[in-house]
Swiss-Prot record:
Superkingdom, taxonomy of origin: Bacteria
Known catalytic reactions: L-seryl-[protein] + ATP = 3-O-(5'-adenylyl)-L-seryl-[protein] + diphosphate; L-threonyl-[protein] + ATP = 3-O-(5'-adenylyl)-L-threonyl-[protein] + diphosphate; L-tyrosyl-[protein] + ATP = O-(5'-adenylyl)-L-tyrosyl-[protein] + diphosphate; L-histidyl-[protein] + UTP = N(tele)-(5'-uridylyl)-L-histidyl-[protein] + diphosphate
Residues at which ATP binds: 91, 93-94, 114, 126-127, 177, 184, 263
Binding site for Mg(2+): 254, 263
EC number: 2.7.7.-, 2.7.7.108
Cofactor annotation: Mg(2+); Mn(2+)
Protein name: Protein nucleotidyltransferase YdiU
Function recorded in the entry: Nucleotidyltransferase involved in the post-translational modification of proteins. It can catalyze the addition of adenosine monophosphate (AMP) or uridine monophosphate (UMP) to a protein, resulting in modifications known as AMPylation and UMPylation.
Active-site residues annotated for this sequence: 253
Family according to the record: Belongs to the SELO family.
Gene Ontology MF term list: AMPylase activity; ATP binding; magnesium ion binding
Record-linked NCBIfam families: PRK00029.1 (NF000658)
Length: 488
């Protein structure tokens, strides 16, 4: 572990303690004229880095892959994955882990360059990334962080001075991604597919030490690992659903063992409440639609359980039973987390038998009247019932009376209930049309002011500030249906 005291780099490379089949050591491919277009000051400071130093030419070179900080050990990680249900051997096709930053508080975070050039896993790709998708990941990941949804984060975006060629010629860019780790369900699938139980154990032991040290001495630690990952994913997916977030590409290589959201390619936030909402242009069957996300998470976790079967128990039948028993607990844990979150969104402290019905009635009405998901809860929080089809309907007025009498029966005051709602119903989300406006200004006009203003508003989604109101409006009909593309 080497520390550069001026900038604060303090890199370790624990991933290289795994068998070499899990990665390939390879340097990033240099670019012609890197330019820093976005730096995350607050994240840099939390990592123990000095923002002013990071703006210097030598540090910008690091973000571009033209140089490496002391202690860096660049490598591309190998993994597999079910992509829309089809199994493939994969790997970092355009990203490199340059090291693990140890923060002043002793936490460990992967520092990864995304768009850093081809690797042995590129599968004929150029290993590069376009500016628009990299800025998009920056905006959405930082919005998720502000919403208190576990996520990878974005430290910096640099332009490369070189074009990337997709459907058209686009400006190239590299994103510096920060994650608790990049270990995925697909990493375990990769280990299992190769057939080495020793390699599988090495990966499981490393993962436990890194993410779940509290279970290291557990009698059945590999079962405990599966339990912990299920618990974190149940919590994560509940938070997605509560915020109206649609990931769009829940392949097993995009499900982290740490429980963080990763890969912001075709993701988007729901406008009108609709269980069938799909934004991704490639998800033609709606596999990863909003309402399917909990089921797909369970499916992905079942693939993790399958991968762990050789080390769950020496008897295969017993191992299979353990795997099935643990996976069956996901839906119970998810439902519990989602229900608790929904109660908070409606200001319900106590438990009453009809609470489930109260929540379901509201959601059914929202779907029937195509009500905006975020703004409906925002209006309820402000007790500002606007002139919309939902709020004007007789069934909503009846529901509203039931809800108000439910609030009246609580020991806590209505003021406390509305305060809890305010802390759980964001006033602002990264609306798809607003994100596109920011990207258009930055990529086409080299104007980052629109993005900066949007990021500032998104940084405090529960503020209910008048400054944010312009970002609360849903898109005009001309901006629908919104389609996303897997540009990251």
């Amino acid at each position: 572990m080497t520390k550069n005291n001026e900038t604060g780099w303090n890199l370790d490379n624990s991933y290289t303690t795994l068998p070499q089949s899990f990665y390939t050591e390879i340097p990033p491919t240099p670019v012609s004229s890197p330019e820093l277009v976005k730096l995350n000051h607050s994240l840099a400071i939390s990592l123990g880095l000095t923002p002013e130093e990071l703006k210097k030419e030598a540090e910008i070179a690091i973000f571009a892959g033209n140089g490496l900080p002391e202690g860096a050990h660049p490598l591309a990680q190998a993994y597999a994955g079910h992509q829309f249900g089809h199994f493939n051997m994969l790997g970092d096709g355009r990203a490199l882990l340059i090291g693990e930053q140890i923060t002043p508080s002793g936490e460990r975070f992967d520092i990864q360059l995304k768009g850093s050039g081809p690797t042995p896993y590129s599968r004929r790709g150029d290993g590069r990334a376009a500016l628009g998708p990299m800025l998009r990941e920056y905006i959405i990941s930082e919005a998720m962080y502000a919403l208190d949804i576990p996520t990878t984060r974005s430290l910096a975006v640099v332009t490369t001075g070189e074009p990337t060629y997709r459907e058209t010629k686009l400006p190239g860019a590299i994103l510096t991604r920060v994650a608790s780790s990049h270990i995925r369900v697909g990493t375990f699938q990769y280990a299992a597919a190769r057939g080495s139980i020793e390699d599988l154990k090495s990966l499981a032991d490393y993962t436990i030490k890194r993410h779940y040290p509290e279970i290291e001495s557990h009698e059945n630690r590999y079962t405990a690992l599966l339990q912990e990952v299920i618990k974190r994913q149940a919590s994560l997916i509940a938070k997605w659903q509560l915020a109206g977030f649609i990931h769009g590409v829940m392949n097993t290589d995009n499900i982290t063992i740490s429980g963080e959201t990763i890969d912001y390619g075709p993701c988007a936030f729901m406008d009108n409440y609709d269980q069938g909402t799909v934004f991704s242009s490639i998800d033609t069957q709606g596999r990863y639609a909003y309402g399917n996300q909990p089921y797909m998470a369970a499916w992905d976790l079942a693939r993790l359980a399958e991968s762990l079967i050789p080390i769950l128990h020496e008897d295969e039948e017993e191992a299979l039973k353990i795997a099935q028993d643990e996976i069956s607990k996901f839906s119970v844990q998810y439902e519990k987390q989602w229900f608790l979150g929904m109660k908070k969104k409606l200001g319900l402290f106590s438990n009453e038998e009809q609470d489930h019905s109260l929540i379901e009635q509201l959601l059914k009405m929202m779907e029937k009247y195509k009500a905006d998901y975020t703004n409906t809860f925002r209006s309820l929080t402000l007790d500002a019932i606007e002139n919309t089809a939902l709020f004007e309907s007789p069934e909503f007025k009846e529901w509203y009376k039931l809800w108000q009498s439910r609030l009246d029966r609580q020991e806590q005051s209505k003021e406390n209930a509305y305060e809890m709602m305010k802390n759980n119903n964001p006033s602002i989300i990264p609306r798809n049309h607003r994100v596109e406006e920011a990207l258009e200004a930055a990529v086409t006009n080299d104007d980052y002011s629109v993005m900066e203003k949007l990021l500032e508003a998104l940084s405090n989604p529960y503020a209910y500030s008048t400054d944010q109101e312009e970002y609360c409006a849903p898109p005009a009909p001309t901006n629908r249906p919104y389609r996303t593309f897997c540009g990251t």
